Amino acid sequence: MSLAAMGDAAAATAPVNDYKALVCVFLYGANDHGNTVVPYDSTNYASYANIRAALATPYSQLLPLTPDVALPSGAQMALAPQLTGLKSLFDAGAMGVMLNVGTLVVPTTLAQYKAQSVPLPPKLFSHNDQQSVWQSSLAEGATSGWGGRLGDLFLNQNGTSTFTCMNVSGNAVFVSGQQAVQYQVSSSGAVKLNATASNAFGSSAVSKAMLALSQGSSSRWMENEHARIMARAIQAEAQLSSGLAGVPALSTPFNASNPLAMQLQMVARTIAARGAMGTKRQVFFVSLGGFDLHDNLVAQHPGLLTRISEALSSFHAATVELGVANQVTTFTASDFGRTLTSNGDGSDHGWGSHHFVVGGAVAGKRFFGKLPVTAVNGPDDVGQGRLLPTTSVDQLGAALATWFGVADSDLPTVFPHVRNFAAGTLPLFR
């Protein structure tokens, strides 16, 4: 889509008077979904334990889920023992579980995959490539992500468009749009520009020169562009810092030793300052790494799950405190799933995975999508217990985007493959 076309789409977006935020929690390295959402009925747990061998979580430690809509054929699922906070959210109806979602170009059967008779996502099982595809719905090297393209549609709805797409964890294509530029902050607030500090690079003269450059004009195009970018950055830093300073501290506790929790605390603080910043639609990106557990899975994965549970439950509690729980939806994402089979000490690169969707507007206490068969060489297995996704990232994203306020006619501008799938959105929301 051209910049002009995207601009026309943004201009055509119906005015919004409420506030909504989407928060992507990306789990870098590929979370082991097999030990995150676990079969609990006796038949499927026995199959799981047999396949996973030493990786299997003991049955007595699992946290069983009782959904409002039962799974077919008497199937039951449970959460890992470390996910107590998420279990509480599920039981309260504030969280749903998205089953077997992954990157797809078109609906794909096992026979089609084996015959290579339909287009497949590029370079399956590759971290960099699949991170890019998950975040952009395009091939690795994409310059815009679907979170950023959502932001493109709502730039003119925000008083300051700079705060439409925000990243609290560095740089990610997910929140880069064709017009929207991701604004990066730290867990403690706006990142101060060294060049505008009172003593930049050890010299007050340098600071004065940089400030003058940002405020002046020149016959040289590059100098003017630099000045424009610097001026925008200085203004955004001041506006965000002022907005954060003007809201009361959150009473909801966040674990300061949990980096994901601190990122989400910053998101909550930014949402609290939405009035001062004039924002009505925002897309946030946070992340946690360390999930590529080819070995030491039993030792290391539980600690990562604890961080996820702590962070997401604290963040949801903060949205309740701020009175915006129904206006904020958080979802997890990852490179891909992992093999159900064990390599002896861990699991290897997979494809489909299970994910969480959290928020007051979510039709919680439910499973969404199709439950895969727990079996190696089964109907959902492309090899070694790698799940063939039955719900595409585009379908999941389209459901989130529809809740966000995107018209059906605009969905293909954000999700290039969504028209390849059945019409209608996943029933993620009330």
Model-found features: residue ranges?
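Feature for exported/extracytoplasmic and membrane-associated proteins, marking the mature portion
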Residues: 1-321, 341, 357-358, 366-430
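Active-site lining segments that contact anionic ligands and/or coordinate catalytic metals
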Residues: 281-283, 325-327, 333, 350-353, ...
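Short glycine/threonine-rich loop-to-helix capping motif typified by GTGT followed
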Residues: 295-300, 336-352
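Metal-dependent active-site segment of extracytoplasmic phospho-/sulfohydrolases and closely related
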Residues: 319-344
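Catalytic phosphate/nucleotide-handling subdomain of diverse soluble enzymes
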Residues: 346-347, 356-358, 362
